[in-house]
Structure formats: structure tokens, C-alpha cells
């Protein structure tokens, strides 16, 4: 640990990227890159992270569990439906009880308000592993992936095409925080949440970022350095079949990417549905970096875990 310091964060929890400063985000990314090169750093020896899941997961569960093992700690899987919370115990009571047993909580659930209450009522760090509104851990890994390719955020254009969902929300806040240019193109009726857009625009005024919300995908990806998409059907929306027709012009394919820079990179938070939001030709092509991006979930989250746990130790 002689080359990189553990970032000092002015927060107990990470619920959205709004809680972090630009300097804290950059420090986390640099620390994550260090941990990527030094996987077995026992910085959380003996620590226990509770992992509460109300939604299915591959990347979030495996990356957090593997991350805790590599850091010398332990990740404890907790099925939300099998906990007493699933039978009516309050979020507040659950938070207070878990604070006596474990050292931190990661929760992947539906309601963002529940995550906020869990953080408020617990004395240990709480990390948002995904809600219907935000996905900050994914956005941290996305920023790390972009930074590894460019070594800067200034002058970089990220184009997000598709549904203005939780991933889009976190990317808007992330881009605004680091001063990046982000365009979003969605069908009418599927724009990102207006309040979150307002927050991103307010942050952008301070950092020099540029945020644009559009409906034209060609305009959004014009001269883009990175093109990003997500599934058209998020968890819980599987019945909305009419979305397929509406979203078809927003598919990432060889015709659309012609508008981007020739050196563009393709990003996707995964899982992907080939031939829906993206063609196999693009996601499996030479300019796709989706698996490196997925791998960075592990390293970005390890950096976050160490920083939050160490921060709580210093405050206690």
C-alpha cells in the first residue's frame, strides 16, 4: 500500500453517486486500478459484509463475494425473501439488528426509499447494489473502464441509447461529477427521471460537464468516444411487449455506430439480449469492452468497500 492511499470519503454509505465529490471518485478509480494489479491485499481481514438480495444477480453477487474474499473478509448471502423483512419486520429493525452482527451491508432491491431507510437506521456502511432508481456500483465500474482507456474524462463523450432507467440515472450523475459530456437518446415516454436530470445538470454547471437529453439516436452517438446501452426490459417489466417495436430504432448496430468516432468503444452493463438492444456483431466485435467493464465491477467495489470500512473505523 505504499503507492496508493485509501481514499477518504465524506460519507458512511454509498446510495447514489451524488454523495461523492469529483476528487473522491477519481481517488476511488485510482485505488481500484491499484487493487486490480494487487488482487490479494488483506485490507478487510475478518470483516463481514451482508449481501441482501431481492433481485436476481450474477455480477453483483459474485463480484462482492469474491471481492471480500480477496480482501481477507467474508461475504454473507442473505435472501431478502427468506429474511424476516420478507414477513413484515421493518427495515429499521433489520438495520439495527444487522449492525450488531456484521460490518457492512450491500443491498440489491426494488425500492430506493428502503435503502435510504436502511442506511439511516444502521450504524454500519450500506452500499446500494441496485434499486429501481440507481445503480452506483455499476457507474463506478463504468467510469473506471473509461478512465483506463482514456486516462481522462475531459473532452470525452459518452452516448447512452435506450431506456432512461437506473443505469442511465447513475451514469448521468457520474458523468456530471467527473466533467464528462454525456448524451442520452430514448424513445418518447422513456426519458430518465426529471429530478435526477435536474440534479445532473446542476452538478454539470459546477464541473463543466455537458448533459443532453435527446430522442434522436444518431445525434446522440455523433462523434461519441463510448456508446452504452442496457436491456430494453428491466427486471419487473417483462410484460411490456410493445416496447420492442418502440425501441427498435435505438438498437446499437453497425449503421448507428457509423456516426460515432471510428475509435469508439462499446459498453453494456450486462446481461445483454443479442439482436435486441445490440447486435451480436457489435457486442462481440473488436470495439466492445463489455467483459473488461464487467470485470471492473470487482475492483471498483473493492476500492469502495475498503474506503467505506476504513472510514467508519476512523470515525468510531
Swiss-Prot record:
Residues bound to carbamoyl phosphate are 57-60, 84, 108, 135-138, 269-270, 297
Q: Which domain of life is it from?
A: Bacteria
Task: Write out the pathway annotation from the protein's UniProt entry.
Answer: Amino-acid biosynthesis; L-arginine biosynthesis; L-arginine from L-ornithine and carbamoyl phosphate: step 1/3
What keywords are assigned to this protein? Amino-acid biosynthesis, Arginine biosynthesis, Cytoplasm, Transferase
Key word Manganese present:
no
Subcellular localization, as worded in the UniProt entry: Cytoplasm
Q: Which GO terms describe its cellular component?
A: cytoplasm
Which transformation does this protein catalyse, written as a reaction?
Answer: carbamoyl phosphate + L-ornithine = L-citrulline + phosphate + H(+)
| GO MF term set | amino acid binding; ornithine carbamoyltransferase activity
Is Electron transport set as a keyword in this record?
no
Q: Please provide the Gene Ontology terms (biological process) for this protein.
A: arginine biosynthetic process via ornithine; citrulline biosynthetic process; L-arginine biosynthetic process
- This enzyme's EC code(s): 2.1.3.3
Q: Please explain the role this protein plays, according to its UniProt record.
A: Reversibly catalyzes the transfer of the carbamoyl group from carbamoyl phosphate (CP) to the N(epsilon) atom of ornithine (ORN) to produce L-citrulline.
What family does the Swiss-Prot or TrEMBL record give for this protein? Belongs to the aspartate/ornithine carbamoyltransferase superfamily. OTCase family.
| NCBIfam families found in the cross-reference section | orni_carb_tr, PRK00779.1
The subunit field of the Swiss-Prot or TrEMBL record says: Homotrimer.
Protein name (database record): Ornithine carbamoyltransferase
- List the lineage, top down: Bacteria, Bacillati, Bacillota, Bacilli, Bacillales
The gene is: argF
Amino acid at each position: 500500500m505504499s503507492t496508493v492511499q485509501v481514499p477518504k470519503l465524506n460519507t458512511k454509505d454509498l446510495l447514489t453517486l451524488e454523495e461523492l465529490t469529483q476528487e473522491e471518485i477519481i481517488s476511488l478509480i485510482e485505488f481500484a486500478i491499484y487493487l486490480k494489479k494487487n488482487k490479494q491485499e488483506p485490507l478487510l481481514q475478518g470483516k463481514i459484509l451482508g449481501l441482501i438480495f431481492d433481485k436476481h444477480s450474477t455480477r453483483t453477487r459474485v463480484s462482492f463475494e469474491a471481492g471480500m474474499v480477496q480482501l481477507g473478509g467474508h461475504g454473507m448471502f442473505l435472501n431478502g425473501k427468506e429474511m424476516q423483512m420478507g414477513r413484515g419486520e421493518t427495515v429499521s429493525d433489520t438495520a439495527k439488528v444487522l449492525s450488531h452482527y456484521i460490518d457492512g451491508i450491500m443491498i440489491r432491491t426494488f425500492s430506493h426509499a428502503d435503502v435510504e431507510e436502511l442506511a439511516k437506521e444502521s450504524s454500519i456502511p450500506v452500499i446500494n447494489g441496485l434499486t429501481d432508481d440507481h445503480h452506483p456500483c455499476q457507474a463506478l465500474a463504468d467510469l473506471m473502464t473509461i478512465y483506463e482507456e482514456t486516462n481522462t474524462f475531459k473532452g470525452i463523450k459518452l452516448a447512452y441509447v435506450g431506456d432512461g432507467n437506473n443505469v442511465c440515472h447513475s451514469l448521468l450523475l457520474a458523468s456530471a461529477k467527473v466533467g464528462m459530456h454525456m448524451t442520452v437518446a430514448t424513445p418518447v415516454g422513456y426519458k430518465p427521471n426529471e429530478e435526477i436530470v435536474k440534479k445532473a445538470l446542476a452538478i454539470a454547471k459546477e464541473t463543466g460537464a455537458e448533459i443532453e437529453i435527446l430522442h434522436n439516436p444518431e445525434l446522440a452517438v455523433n462523434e461519441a468516444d463510448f456508446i452504452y446501452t442496457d436491456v430494453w426490459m428491466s427486471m419487473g417489466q417483462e410484460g411490456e411487449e410493445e416496447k420492442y417495436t418502440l425501441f427498435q430504432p435505438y438498437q446499437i448496430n453497425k449503421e448507428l455506430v457509423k456516426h460515432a468516432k471510428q475509435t469508439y468503444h462499446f459498453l453494456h452493463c450486462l446481461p445483454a439480449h443479442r439482436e435486441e438492444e445490440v447486435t451480436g456483431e457489435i457486442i462481440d466485435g473488436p470495439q466492445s469492452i463489455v467483459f473488461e467493464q464487467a470485470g471492473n465491477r470487482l475492483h471498483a467495489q473493492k476500492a469502495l468497500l475498503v474506503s467505506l470500512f476504513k472510514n467508519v473505523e476512523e470515525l468510531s
